[in-house]
Amino acid sequence: MHFLLHRPDAERDAGILMNGQVVLCRGINDGVELDRTIRDLSSYRPAMRSVSIVPVGLTKYRDGLAPLTPFDRESAGLVIDQIEDWQKRLAADGVDPVSPHFVHASDEWYILAGRELPEEERYDGYLQLENGVGMVRLLENEVRAALESPSFLKEADEAVDSTGRKVILACGKLIENHLKKLTGWIMERWPYVEICVRAIRNDFFGERITVSGLITGGDLIRQLRDAAGCADELLIPVSMLRSGEKVFLDDLTTEDVQRELKIPVRITWTGGEEFLRACLGMEASAESERQVYESWE
C-alpha cells in the first residue's frame, strides 16, 4: 500500500485537494481490504476530500482475463453497510467538517441492493457526481423542486401542448425504475403527455453493463426501431455521448440515430428542470444549452 500512496503524499504536501475512487472487485479488494483502504485514505483528510467506492464493470470482452465474480443483491448490501459504518465513524471525528462523511457508495450499490438512496445531506455537496455518487438523488430532488415551483409550473402550463405529446426516454437498466417514478409524477401533473421509459439492453459491451453512459447508438437503433415511429421525440442523456461531441461510443452520431429511427433526438439530463423541459417539449434554458452544446457548435 505504501507504493500506491506515494502520489497522495506528494499532492497533500503540495497543498492540492484530492478526490479519490476505489474500484471494488468481489473477493479481491473488498471486506477487510476495503477497510484498510478507507483507513489509509482517510488519514489524508482534509486534503483528501472524498472517496467513492464503485463496483468493477464486467463487459463481455473477458477472454484471457482473470475471472471476476459480479456483486449481487446480498454482497452489495454488505458493501453499503461497511461504507455507512465508516461514514458514521469519520463524521464523528470532526477532522473535516466540510465533507465529514468522506467515503461514499455509488448509486449502483443501492440500486443493486434494492435499498433507498441516502438523504442529500450525506453526499457532502455531491463531490463525487462524476463517479455516479448521488446522481439519482440530485435528479430526483431537482425534479421535485421544479414541480413545486409556481413560476416553473406557470411557464410549463403555458408552453405544453394540451393536444398531446408522446416521447421515448432511453436509459440504461440501472436507472429505469427511478426514471419511471419521475415520469410518473410528470404524467400525473400533465396527463396529456405520455413518456415511455425504455431501458436499453447493452449488447455492445454485454448485459452486465447497465449504466446509461455506456449505451451505444447501434443498440438504440436496434431496440427502438419498433417504437420510435409513434413518438414525437427520443430523449437521451448527454452521458451517452463522448464529451464535447454528438458521437456515441460505437462512432455512430445522433444524426445517424435520427435518420435510422426517423425521429428527432433531444439531448438532455443536465439537471432536474431541464429533464422536465425535455419531457414536456419546452425550450431548454440558456444555461442548459450552454452546458450541453458549448463545444459542439
Please state what every model-predicted region is.
Residues 2, 35-36, 249-253:
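Charged helix-capping and loop-helix junction motifs
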Residues 64-71, 244-247:
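Short, flexible/disordered intra-domain loops and linkers
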Residues 113-297:
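Radical SAM enzyme core and accessory elements
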Residues 37-38, 69-71, 283-286:
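Short, hinge-like loop/turn segments at secondary-structure boundaries
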Residues 24-27, 69, 169:
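Short, charged/polar micro-motifs that form catalytic or ligand-binding hotspots
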Residues 70-77, 251:
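Short, conserved loop/turn and helix-capping segments at secondary-structure boundaries
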Residues 5-64, 74-108:
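Conserved C-terminal portion of the radical SAM core fold
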Residues 1-21, 185-201:
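Well-ordered, non-transmembrane segments within structured domains
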